[in-house]
């Protein structure tokens, strides 16, 4: 008698593998609290941002968006650079500029 393949195991394995691939090519996003002033996001950089407005932290290469929080509050949604798997023989570069141009990348041109 032959054993039947465990379709649940195969499906879960496929989904996990697919998720790992997505993580390696996608930026991450997180949501957190931020100071509020006059109903706007106050990142303490001298400017106030309305819901939907974006600003950048080019030193750490983030894009931040002021979003509607819970119960009438505001929050910040932080988007960062994609995470890349290490590439053998390539050099990791850290360019300057505004997000997403400041995101690190692998330079494989000398291969």
From Swiss-Prot:
One of its GO terms (molecular function) is toxin activity. Its main location: secreted. Residues 1-28 form the signal peptide. The keyword Signal applies. Expressed by the venom gland. GO terms for cellular component: extracellular region. It is found in: Secreted. The keyword Secreted applies. Contains 4 disulfide bonds. Keywords: Disulfide bond, Secreted, Signal, Toxin. Pfam families: SVWC. Belongs to the scoloptoxin-16 family. This is U-scoloptoxin(16)-Sm2a.
